[in-house]
Amino acid sequence: WTPEQPNLYALLLSVNNQKQTVDTKYERFGWREWTLQGTTQYLNGEPYALHGDSWHFMGIPQMTRRYAWAWFTAIKGMNANAVRPHAQVYPRFYLDMADEMGICVLNETANWASDGGPKLDSDLFWEASKEHLKRFVLRDRNHASVFGWSISNENKPVILHVYNRPELMPVQKKAWEEWRDIVHQYDPTRPWISADGEDDGDGILPVTVGHYGDINSMKRWIEIGKPWGIGEHSMAYYGTPEQVAKYNGERAYESQEGRMEGLANECYNLIVNQRQMGASYSTVFNMAWYALKPLPLGKKDKSKAPTVEADGVFFGDYKEGVPGVQPERVGPYCTT
């Protein structure tokens, strides 16, 4: 299995009792091996750099295999081969589609804190996080597309710079050790264990992954001496026209398209720098949400502003007692 040739196989197990089949289990898998040597990641014995996208699952518009297919098709179309499902457990079909389409997945837990998040001063959180990670690894470890595990996202910067609680860092360091060991126990086949936006977990983890920063930040990540990557980069989600104007001047103020042109300039240079400096995983944050044009779902007359009553994709009436989510409507332009 490689992104270029995502060959898959099936294991079919049957339990028989007195010549009668009483249970059957089907498991799909792919043959491949990821290894780390020095500062480089290898796939099937060859150096292999990953170029990915990332986004945070938003809900109903993303709850179809077709959305996963569209996202991964866009990733392939931008000459990339990887994805990080950001900060939560995604539906299984995302990994199924990645297996089939040749997308390498940095599988990330829900142990994240970006600008708020979990109650990091509660023992209950830290205990629950271990069971969560165990179940997460057991669920997804047979997917060929999963190349590594991201065990947390931005916990450290939130502890230090949002909560201003440096006394919580010993607890976080202990958790990194426990989370790393849980991954080793339940999946000894994947050496990539990282914490997105937290460097190498103060030396605890085998891989370094940073967020944002500049050339000096990348030099610092390289100096750690491990395979390294960037999980989030660019100012796409926060850059004001004033900030973007450093790339394309007053054009950044004229329209959203002008702003995006400036961001494209920034992102191009960031990606060039990441590649030239030998990142094992390079990305900007992100293509799916900020760089793709949203689709006018269920809207025929695009000359008028959409309304809740007339536009969108409408579903059937709510049925009491039926399990699962029952959406009422998916609105135009909600896919990106």
Regions found by a protein language model. Give the residues of each.
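The substrate-binding groove and active-site-proximal loops of carbohydrate-active enzymes
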Residues: 2-3, 54-66, 74-86, 108-128, ...
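Flexible loop/turn segments at secondary-structure boundaries
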Residues: 91-93, 114-115, 155-159, 200-202, ...
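Catalytic metal-binding/acid-base residues of hydrolase active sites
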Residues: 88, 110, 152-156, 188, ...
